Structures are given as structure tokens and as C-alpha cells.
Curated annotation (Swiss-Prot):
Residues 36-152, 161-315, 424-566 form the Plastocyanin-like domain. It comes from Oryza sativa subsp. japonica (Rice). Cu cation 2 binds at H88, H131, H547. This is Laccase-19. Its EC number is 1.10.3.2. Cu cation 4 binds at N483, C546, H551, M556.
């Protein structure tokens, strides 16, 4: 946890205390927290930076609940601009109003104001997380959201302890300024280091002052449930502990078939549960979180790494005179371990939850790439790369224009959407092409012919109880990134992933209908595709976006409208009393 400045410390000590109350009612409880969001100063690498935190903590407080509980979080905004809190992965069944997606389900909480989020957590067990959902604030405003089984039983031996491992990034640049620069088309800024639970690690130093490392204390022979969460804005991470192996047992609040590995790959937005047994000779062992990135000709950024420590009870600070073992990490440009890790995971079959829809009502084929538009306009610029153009991210050649003064859900519910959005999000790209041709990465005539792009707020509407299949296809238009796609309000069946261009005749045979993963964030591999299915059983307005922050800001997003079902129990209820409509609420955005 970072140290507070004196003023902020007094503020938090006198006026702000974390309130976490569990009021037992029958089998379920009400778990209540107060989140005070404020600025504070933190010093790393010889520089003091203003950061934005909850209750003086980076990462923020852990929300720890049992399946079936009601969660109540009072958010007090002491920032000079608005923000929302999103409960990443919580299904929010019939509680879309509490999803916390800025300008999608609600307008940001204005400066000096308060807002209460209230929702139930049902049908989910495992690791989720929460984070700010406006601008780049989630880099430091985030925390774990743990859902424990109601009966206290796991489908694996109960661990001695569970520990959140929150992987993030340390930015010296003010996050609000970072957001402004990216909104203006400047993507040259980078974090200075990776972090593990807010610690930069001893590989980072300045003037021979070594940064603090996260330390995991263990006892020989005991097992530990590591809840590995990637909160980073920019990068997917490889995570390894020297001398130890993992058993992957869950992801995104759902159990997985146990999978043994010596390295975890976690994309932005993902939460991976792994069991680590402390079965190595008692000593100290390094853990490493290493960012990966595509090789050239993709744009290159520095290597981000954080190093922590696993420390066995009874061992000495000098590690008994032996060097501390280091894990051997992949080359940062080798993205294949990510593909193999994700493709090898399967869901733990459950007769009630794993009912893959075999009939498909609507199919979408969604390409993910980049394009460019003229500044001040919403269409592709023919002036090539110049100050008059701005690079955007697209889905089927449409870059999402995020609302700035109103919330899409409110307009939909009130029937006042005219002029705010349209419901013609394209279900396929304008024309097929060789989506993974690496000759498209450098800007040029070949890429330019396929690039035509426009910016608009285009949504897709579904009737209640529609069976939907989406093929996400990563492209090499100006870059070849992977794309961690996150759908709010839903768990989706991840039927298959593959490399190259999706081919229906060939690749449908690879679909796993027996025990697919249930995920809220799907890693679409670099130069590849992912196939998902889900049933629209949760009415409301649900944001779909890439979880790379620069892709969100550039427009790789849309929203799905799910209509009400035939009964009150299948319909979105009116907004709760605590919901504040946008209106003239003194909203101040950076």
C-alpha cells in the first residue's frame, strides 16, 4: 500500500473509514463498503506522482462475498472530475443500472457527490474484480472481487490461504493527461514498470534505491490459491514462480478443469485462479510478471517487468547463502505461449450451467483492427499519416463514438435515443480479405484500400432469449495485437480459438460443445480468432469492448441492447431509488 500524503492521511483517518458490514439474513448477507476516491502522492523511481486511489490503497480494497450475497458500495467522489466503478464480471442479472460503465449504463458520479451501487451476486464463484470505468483511472483505481462458494466447498482441495496477485503498471505520467494524449491520437507514452500488488519490485531502481517487492510468505507443504488479475492498461502478462508449478482451477468467476502448467498467461481484464503448492526445498524464490508484445513490424514499447518473492517460513534473508532462483521467462515477443495457455483450458462441466446453445438465432463475424479518420470529421482521411489524421480502433470498420454527456441505458429506457445512437452495428465487415496478412501492418496502399473507417455510435439490438454466436477475428490492419474482448453482463461459452483466418467449413469442427470455458473476457489471439456463444437472458444495455485501454479510447467497442422478456421476472426493472439520472448534474469530465 502506498503511503498517504499528510493531508490525505488526515482526510482518510478522520472522515473516511472502510466500512465492511455483513448483515446475515438467512443464508445470504449484505456486504457493505464505503469507497472514498481521492488523489494522493506516491514516490517511485525518484519521482513523486499524483495518483488516484480508493481509501488510500493501491490496489484498492478487496470485496469479499459469498455466492448469493447482496453487495452495497457507497462511492464518495473526492476527485475534481467524474468517475464510475464497474464490477468486472459480475453478471448483474436485471441490475444493469449498477454495472458502472461510464456513459453506457450511467453518467459519472460528479465531483463532490456520492453514489450507492447495490446488486446481488448469484451463480458465480471465483475471482472477479472492480475498477474505475472512465478515462485511464483503472490503472490505480482497482481491486479484487472474490466470490466464495455458499457451501464452503471447492472442487479441489481447500487451500491454506488465498492471495490476490494483482498485476498492473506504474505510470509516472498523470493518468488524466495520459487519457487526453490518447484521445488526441498520441500513443507514444508508456508505463515505467509492471507492478505486483502495487509493488514495482527490486528490478526497478533509481540512484541505487531499490524498489520494494511483493512478498508471498508460505509454509512448506501447504497449498495456496493465487487469484491472478491483470489490471494493466497496455499489456498481457506472463507470470511465473521459480521452482514451482501451478494448477489452473478457475477463470472469470467460473471453475475450470484442472490444468497443470509452470506459467500463467493473463490478458487485461482476465482473472485466473491457480493452486500453487509450496513443495520446493524451503528457501526464497523469485516470481516474475513480464509483459509480452507482438514483434516488429508492430510498434515497439519497452519491456515491463516486476519481480516479487516467495519466502518459505524459517528461511533466512540471505537464502542460506544461495542465490535466489529466477524463473526462466519467454522472449517478450513470443506470443505463442499465450495462445497455447488459453487454448488448452476447458470448463469444469456442470449440468446446469454448461448448456451450450446448439441452435443459433443470430451470427456475427466481427473483425478487430485499426484505421484512421480526419481530425474533426468522422470518416477516413485520404491524407495518409499526417497531423490531419488520427488513428482509431474498429470493429467491422466502425470506430465507436462514446457519448460524452448522456448514458445510453437511460436514453434507451426512456425512449429518447434519437440522435444519440443507431441500432445498425454491422454484423460482418464491409468485405472479406486476408485478415492476417502481415503485409497490412505497415501503412501503405494495400492497407489503405481496406481501411475505410467511420466513427459513430452504432449498437446492436437483440430480442430476449436469442441464441447468439460471435466470431471475433483479429486483423493485421496497421498492427497485430491480440484483443481481450470483454462483454458486460454475461458469461459466454468460449467454443474455440485458432490462428489465421477463421474458416467456417474447417473450424466449426473444432468447437467444444461438451465443456467449454465460461468467460466474461475472451482473449482473441494475435493473428487469430475466437468463437463464442451466449443466450440473451439478461435485459439491459451491455458494453462490449477490448480491454486494452488504448483500444477502448480509440473506439474498439459497441453496446448490445437486450430487450425485455415476456414477464416482469425477465424484464429490466425501473432504475433504483439511488440511481442518479444524467440531466444537469454538474458533470465535470477531464
Amino acid at each position: 500500500m502506498e503511503k498517504l500524503s499528510m493531508v490525505t492521511s488526515l482526510l482518510c483517518a478522520i472522515t473516511v473509514a472502510v466500512l465492511a458490514v455483513a448483515v446475515v439474513s438467512g443464508e445470504a448477507a449484505v456486504v457493505e463498503h464505503t469507497f472514498v476516491v481521492h488523489e494522493m502522492n506516491a514516490t517511485h523511481l525518484c519521482n513523486t506522482t499524483k495518483i488516484y486511489v480508493v481509501n488510500g490503497q493501491f490496489p484498492g480494497p478487496t470485496v469479499d462475498v459469498t455466492e448469493g450475497d447482496t453487495v452495497v458500495v457507497h462511492v464518495i467522489n473526492k476527485l475534481p472530475f467524474g468517475l464510475t466503478i464497474h464490477w468486472h464480471g459480475v453478471r448483474q442479472m436485471r441490475s444493469c443500472w449498477a454495472d458502472g460503465a461510464g456513459f453506457v449504463t450511467e453518467c459519472p458520479i460528479p465531483p463532490g457527490n456520492e453514489h450507492t451501487y447495490r446488486f446481488n451476486v448469484t451463480g458465480q464463484v471465483g475471482t472477479l474484480w472492480w475498477h474505475a470505468h472512465v478515462t485511464c483511472l483503472r490503472a490505480t483505481i482497482n481491486g479484487a472481487f472474490i466470490v466464495r462458494p455458499r457451501d464452503g466447498k471447492y472442487p479441489f482441495p481447500t487451500p491454506a490461504k488465498d492471495v490476490p496477485i494483482i498485476i498492473g503498471e506504474w505510470w509516472e505520467l498523470d493518468l488524466i493527461e495520459l487519457d487526453r494524449r490518447m484521445m488526441d491520437g498520441n500513443f507514444d507514452d508508456n508505463p515505467l514498470s509492471a507492478t505486483i500488488n502495487g509493488k514495482l519490485g527490486d528490478l526497478s531502481n533509481c540512484s541505487r534505491m531499490v524498489e520494494e517487492s511483493f512478498i508471498l510468505d508460505v509454509k512448506h507443504g501447504e497449498s495456496y490459491l493465487l487469484r491472478v488479475i491483470n489490471t494493466a492498461l497496455f499489456s498481457e502478462y506472463y507470470f511465473r514462480v521459480a521452482g514451482h508449478t501451478f494448477t489452473v482451477v478457475g477463470a472469470d468467476g467460473n471453475y475450470l478443469t484442472p490444468f497443470k502448467t509452470d506459467m500463467v498467461t493473463v490478458a487485461p481484464g482476465e482473472a485466473i485462479d491457480v493452486i500453487m503448492v509450496a513443495d520446493a526445498p524451503p528457501a526464497h524464490y523469485h516470481m516474475i510478471a513480464l509483459a509480452n508484445q507482438p514483434p516488429e513490424p508492430d510498434p515497439q514499447i519497452p519491456v515491463f517487468t516486476s519481480r516479487g518473492l516467495v519466502r518459505y517460513a524459517g528461511t533466512t534473508a540471505n537464502n542460506n547463502g544461495l542465490p535466489v532462483p529466477m524463473p526462466i521467462m519467454p522472449n517478450q515477443h513470443n506470443t505463442m505461449p499465450s495462445y497455447y495457455f488459453h487454448a488448452n483450458l476447458t470448463g469444469l462441466a456442470h449440468p446446469e450451467r454448461h448448456r451450450v446453445p446448439m441452435h443459433v438465432d443470430e451470427r456475427l463475424f466481427v473483425t478487430l483492427g485499426l484505421g484512421s479518420i480526419c481530425r474533426g470529421q468522422n470518416t477516413t482521411c485520404k491524407r495518409r499519416r499526417s497531423p490531419e489524421t488520427i488513428v482509431v480502433a474498429t470493429m467491422n470498420n466502425v470506430s465507436f463514438a462514446h457519448p460524452k454527456t448522456t448514458a445510453l441505458l437511460e436514453r434507451y429506457y426512456d425512449g429518447t435515443s434519437k440522435g444519440v445512437y443507431t441500432e445498425d452495428f454491422p454484423i460482418r465487415p464491409p468485405r472479406p480479405f486476408n485478415y492476417t496478412n502481415r503485409d497490412l501492418i505497415p501503412p501503405g496502399p494495400l492497407e489503405e484500400a481496406l481501411e475505410p473507417t467511420f466513427k459513430a455510435t452504432k449498437l446492436k439490438r437483440f430480442k430476449y432469449n436469442t441464441s447468439v454466436e460471435i466470431i471475433f477475428q483479429s486483423t493485421t490492419l496497421m498492427q497485430s495485437d491480440s484483443n481481450p474482448m470483454h462483454l458486460h453482463g454475461y458469461d459466454v461459452f468460449l467454443l474455440a480459438q485458432g490462428l489465421g483466418n477463421f474458416n467456417a467449413k474447417r473450424d466449426v469442427r473444432k468447437f467444444n460443445y461438451h465443456n467449454p470455458q465460461l468467460r466474461n473476457t475472451v482473449q482473441v489471439p494475435r493473428g487469430g480468432w475466437a468463437a463464442i456463444r451466449f443466450v440473451t437472458d439478461n435485459p439491459g444495455m451491455w458494453y462490449l469492448h477490448c480491454h486494452f485501454e488504448f483500444h477502448i479510447i480509440m473506439g474498439m467497442a459497441t453496446a448490445f441492447i437486450v430487450e425485455d422478456g415476456p414477464t416482469p421476472e425477465t424484464s429490466l426493472p425501473p432504475p433504483p431509488p439511488e440511481f442518479k439520472r444524467c440531466g444537469n448534474n454538474g458533470l465535470s469530465q477531464p
